[in-house]
Amino acid sequence: MKCKRLNEVIELLQPAWQKEPDLNLLQFLQKLAKESGFDGELADLTDDILIYHLKMRDSAKDAVIPGLQKDYEEDFKTALLRARGVIKE
Protein backbone atom coordinates (compact mmCIF):
# COMPACT_ATOMS: atom_id res chain seq x y z
CA MET A 1 0.00 0.00 0.00
CA LYS A 2 2.75 2.47 0.91
CA CYS A 3 4.57 1.74 -2.36
CA LYS A 4 1.43 2.51 -4.38
CA ARG A 5 0.90 5.82 -2.58
CA LEU A 6 4.56 6.76 -3.01
CA ASN A 7 4.33 6.09 -6.74
CA GLU A 8 1.14 8.16 -6.94
CA VAL A 9 2.77 11.10 -5.13
CA ILE A 10 5.82 10.92 -7.40
CA GLU A 11 3.67 10.71 -10.56
CA LEU A 12 1.70 13.79 -9.52
CA LEU A 13 4.65 15.71 -8.09
CA GLN A 14 7.02 15.38 -11.05
CA PRO A 15 5.07 17.35 -13.70
CA ALA A 16 4.00 20.00 -11.18
CA TRP A 17 7.55 20.50 -9.90
CA GLN A 18 8.93 20.71 -13.45
CA LYS A 19 6.77 23.79 -13.97
CA GLU A 20 8.67 25.50 -11.12
CA PRO A 21 12.32 24.50 -11.66
CA ASP A 22 13.68 27.37 -9.57
CA LEU A 23 12.34 25.83 -6.33
CA ASN A 24 14.04 23.01 -4.46
CA LEU A 25 11.92 20.11 -3.21
CA LEU A 26 11.27 21.49 0.28
CA GLN A 27 10.38 24.91 -1.06
CA PHE A 28 7.97 23.32 -3.51
CA LEU A 29 6.38 21.16 -0.80
CA GLN A 30 5.97 24.26 1.39
CA LYS A 31 4.31 26.06 -1.52
CA LEU A 32 1.91 23.14 -2.05
CA ALA A 33 1.11 23.03 1.66
CA LYS A 34 0.34 26.75 1.71
CA GLU A 35 -1.81 26.51 -1.45
CA SER A 36 -3.81 23.66 0.07
CA GLY A 37 -4.51 25.65 3.23
CA PHE A 38 -2.34 23.48 5.46
CA ASP A 39 -0.81 25.60 8.23
CA GLY A 40 0.94 23.02 10.41
CA GLU A 41 4.51 21.79 10.39
CA LEU A 42 5.72 20.44 7.06
CA ALA A 43 6.52 17.13 8.78
CA ASP A 44 2.79 16.77 9.56
CA LEU A 45 1.73 17.22 5.92
CA THR A 46 0.06 13.95 4.90
CA ASP A 47 0.33 12.20 1.58
CA ASP A 48 -3.47 12.49 1.25
CA ILE A 49 -3.25 16.28 1.31
CA LEU A 50 -0.49 16.24 -1.32
CA ILE A 51 -2.29 13.78 -3.57
CA TYR A 52 -5.66 15.56 -3.53
CA HIS A 53 -4.10 19.00 -3.83
CA LEU A 54 -1.95 17.95 -6.78
CA LYS A 55 -4.97 16.33 -8.46
CA MET A 56 -7.16 19.39 -7.91
CA ARG A 57 -4.51 22.09 -8.32
CA ASP A 58 -5.23 22.99 -11.94
CA SER A 59 -8.96 22.25 -11.89
CA ALA A 60 -11.81 24.69 -11.47
CA LYS A 61 -12.62 25.79 -7.92
CA ASP A 62 -16.07 24.20 -8.10
CA ALA A 63 -14.84 20.88 -9.55
CA VAL A 64 -15.78 17.69 -7.72
CA ILE A 65 -13.03 15.99 -5.69
CA PRO A 66 -11.74 12.81 -7.41
CA GLY A 67 -13.29 9.72 -5.85
CA LEU A 68 -16.45 11.54 -4.77
CA GLN A 69 -17.99 11.98 -8.24
CA LYS A 70 -19.36 8.41 -8.26
CA ASP A 71 -21.36 9.13 -5.08
CA TYR A 72 -22.55 12.58 -6.17
CA GLU A 73 -26.30 13.23 -6.38
CA GLU A 74 -27.82 16.44 -7.69
CA ASP A 75 -30.62 16.58 -5.17
CA PHE A 76 -30.84 15.49 -1.53
CA LYS A 77 -34.11 13.56 -1.89
CA THR A 78 -32.67 11.24 -4.55
CA ALA A 79 -29.54 10.68 -2.47
CA LEU A 80 -31.62 9.81 0.59
CA LEU A 81 -33.88 7.40 -1.30
CA ARG A 82 -30.87 5.72 -2.93
CA ALA A 83 -29.13 5.36 0.46
CA ARG A 84 -32.25 3.73 1.94
CA GLY A 85 -32.48 1.28 -0.96
CA VAL A 86 -35.75 2.63 -2.34
CA ILE A 87 -34.08 3.58 -5.64
CA LYS A 88 -31.92 0.89 -7.22
CA GLU A 89 -29.24 1.50 -9.86
Curated annotation (Swiss-Prot):
Checking Gene3D superfamilies in the record gives: Protein of unknown function DUF1040 (1.10.1580.20)
The UniProt entry, under InterPro entries, shows:
DUF1040, YihD_sf
This chain belongs to the protein called Protein YihD
Q: Name one GO cellular component term.
A: cytosol
- Domain of life of the organism in this record? Bacteria
**Which family is this protein grouped under?**
To H.influenzae HI_0845.
One Pfam family this chain carries? DUF1040
**Which gene codes for it?**
yihD
